[in-house]
Each structure stands twice: as structure tokens, then as C-alpha cells.
Amino acid sequence: MRYGMVIDLRRCVGCNACTVACKQSNGTPPGMFYSHVSLREEGAYPNATARYTPMLCGHCEEAACVSVCPTGASYRDEAGVVRVDHGKCIGCKYCIAACPYEVRTFLSERIEGYFPGSGLTEQERVMYGGFEVGKVYKCDFCRSKGYTDGIGPSCVRACPGDARVFGDLADPESEVARLLAAEQVRVLGEEYGTKPNVYYVARSGA
């Protein structure tokens, strides 16, 4: 089994539904995001174009974050998902420095919540209860939520344009494997040699 994702940029409208769904599902503190949509503007009026690129952990086969981790906290599980064992994480941030995609986050200070000065609400205390100061956090394809093997990652389910397809790349009959075989795809930062398992179908002319 090797989980992966194909993102069709022809279908992405930059709505950030994936960003919101990820944040809501994982209950991340203010300022912490496991995914986001990058916006790049090209050209000039009246021929300006907006290029949207959803960004998340690539769950690389040759993950730089895993190789530099001195404690084994960053690892690839049996399904090829790059994860963090927070019991082993010492907060050295080597993995953040090594990741060329800048998709890891570090909780550097006590969580203040969305209403500064008023303390955490009861809901926020529940949501943020699993986060520890001095630890690194990232996307795990919703493995920690138990969604991966069933309904799939929250970002995939939330996309109104069906731009994301998730599944087992090792299963030739899976939708994601068939899409990978049928479309011209690319990975971000191929020059880094990390072999991501998140692929992109480019827009026309991109």
C-alpha cells in the first residue's frame, strides 16, 4: 500500500475550502495550517491570470525530514505516510529546515486562542488539548483522525471542484492510480529528489 494524491489544477478555483476543512478537522491553533493554497499572479491587466496551487505535505519516498530527524520522530508508516511521533519529537526543527516545501509547523508558544486576553473557550481547550509547545506538526493525510482508510482526507471531501483524488497508488485499479496513468502529471520540486506522492495535473499553458 502506498497512499498518494493527484490534484487537478484545471479544477482548482482557489476557494480554500481544503484549507478550511483541514483546519477544522485537525483543530489546529491560530496561525497553524497543515495545508494552504498558494496564489501566483501572472501577466498584466487586461490579461492577468491567477494561478492557484494547493500545498500540503508530499509524503515523499525520500523524505528529507525523515532522514535528518535525530530521534526517529519523523517517519514513514507502512502506508507510505510521513508522520510525526510527538513522544519522540524534541523540537530541534531540523525537519522544518530540511523540508523544501515548507509545510511543517512548530508550536513555539502557549496557545492563546482566537480571542486574545480572554483565555481559551471550552471548545478551544478541547480542540487544542492534543497540541504541545515545542513540537512539530504536519499533514498526515488524516491518518491520525482515522479517515485515511475510509472516507478519505478532509481536504479531498471538501473540494467543490473535485480537484483532489486520493487513494492507494500501489493498486492499479484505484481511481488515483488510473488517473496517474492517464494524465500528464508533475511533482513540485522534482529537482530536490524527494519523490513526493502528491502529483499535480497542470493547467493548459502552465
Where are each of the predicted segments found?
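Non-ligating segments of multi-cofactor redox enzymes
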Residues: 1-206
